Regions:
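Phosphate/Mg2+-binding loops and adjacent switch elements
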Residues: 102-213
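Short secondary-structure boundary/capping segments
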Residues: 60-64, 99, 166-170, 215, ...
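Conserved catalytic network of the ASCE P-loop NTPase/AAA+ motor domain
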Residues: 10, 36-40, 74-76, 139-145, ...
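Conserved beta-strand segments of the P-loop GTPase G domain that flank and frequently precede/overlap
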Residues: 19, 47-48, 153, 198-202, ...
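Walker A/P-loop NTP-binding active-site region of P-loop NTPases
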Residues: 19-85, 164-167
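C-terminal lobe/tail of nucleotide-utilizing enzymes
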Residues: 1-10, 191, 195, 205-335
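Pre-Walker A (Motif I) flank of P-loop NTPase domains
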Residues: 11-16
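A conserved catalytic-core segment of Leloir-type glycosyltransferases
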Residues: 68-108
Length: 335
């Protein structure tokens, strides 16, 4: 079994990789984590690598370029910057840095050679993307890390292990030279205690099943699982002792009516029938969520729960909701 909350040992991690099945709110949770980690005059970088511009939409800013820009102020004077990493731009930066091909690289891009290279070479795109994340995570200025933490809004669970572990294969393919050293550096970071991979899920069968599969794959790939972030948790409206009977359809309408009458409410029979049906439906959901939560707990990973919010926006949450989720994360120990 596991314990709830953010483990103290994760305070060492400098790179937080956030993945999850599509539709679980992965981008929103990654943004909230970046805000939580920036609280108290700290600086974090929120990175996306899939070209969706989800961060820009969530923070209501123009599309992010291939440069780090401040997008939010965290409580206590902290700062969140964001970066949309593009494989073609990363390759141009790589060519300019290691081969002094700045102008020539731009010419190659106009000719379509850069897109061709990142499409043709298996794994090269992911090496470039993770290489840029590694550079930002390890970068220093005046003897201090530029960022206290980097949060990566990673590909979904079905692709994340391949995305994170492709650098190991590339390191074997390139035995010498800059690409070899870059791959080795990325491998060291991603397979160290400085990196934690968090999985966002919902208390539903399919997301939970995919979460458990991903945790097992991370272990096999020697990638460090962090926490399971259970998103959109709804509070139960029934006493725990009443859930099993109600979920089984055993709700005494006469008793409900008597209780309502005692409270001064005389409902139409049709309305009462609807109320009883909603009670049964709610109890069925609560019981199903209890079972999926038990499956997650038995996997042994720490669990962090985030409430369902009603604000509308990306993933069903607006910017105010992101700040609220960041506050909840801080309350559960995120530092």
């Amino acid at each position: 079994m596991t314990s709830p909350g953010w483990p103290a040992e994760l305070t060492r991690a400098r790179l937080h990789v956030v993945t999850g099945k599509g539709g679980t709110g992965k981008t929103t949770v990654a943004a909230a984590l970046a805000l939580a980690l920036a609280t108290g005059r700290r600086r974090t970088l929120l990175v996306e690598v899939e070209g969706r511009q989800g961060i820009a939409r969530l923070f209501d800013t123009p599309p992010l370029p291939y440069e780090e820009r401040r997008i939010a102020v965290a409580p206590g004077g902290g700062e969140v910057r964001a970066l949309a990493v593009d494989a073609e731009d990363a390759l141009l930066e790589y060519l300019a840095l290691f081969y002094s091909l700045g102008f020539a690289g731009r010419t190659l891009r106009r000719m379509g050679a850069i897109e061709f290279a990142t499409t043709l070479a298996p794994g090269l795109r992911d090496v470039l993307l993770t290489g840029k994340v590694k550079e930002a995570t390890t970068r220093t200025e005046k003897g201090k890390h530029t960022y206290d933490a980097v949060v990566l809004d990673a590909p979904p669970t079905g692709r994340v292990v391949r995305f994170l572990d492709v650098t190991r294969a590339m390191a074997y393919l390139a035995k010498v030279g800059p690409i070899h050293h870059q791959s080795e550096g990325v491998v060291r970071l991603l397979h160290s205690a400085d990196t934690a991979v968090h999985v966002v899920t919902l208390l539903e069968d399919l997301p939970v099943a995919e979460t458990l599969e991903t945790v097992a794959e991370l272990d096999l790939a020697d990638l460090r699982p962090g926490v399971v972030l259970i998103n959109r948790v709804r509070p139960p409206r029934l006493p725990t002792r009443s859930v099993p009977a109600a979920a089984d359809g055993r709700v005494a309408a006469a008793d409900v009516r008597a209780g309502l009458l005692a409270a001064g409410l005389d409902l139409d029979p049709a309305v009462l029938d609807g109320l009883v049906a909603e009670t049964v439906e709610h109890a069925v959901r609560v019981d199903a969520e209890r079972q999926t939560r038990t499956k997650l707990a038995e996997a042994g990973m720490p669990l962090v729960e985030l409430p369902e919010l009603t604000e509308v926006g990306v993933d069903g949450v607006d910017l105010g909701g992101v700040y609220r989720l960041a506050e909840v994360l801080r309350e559960q120990g995120v530092r």
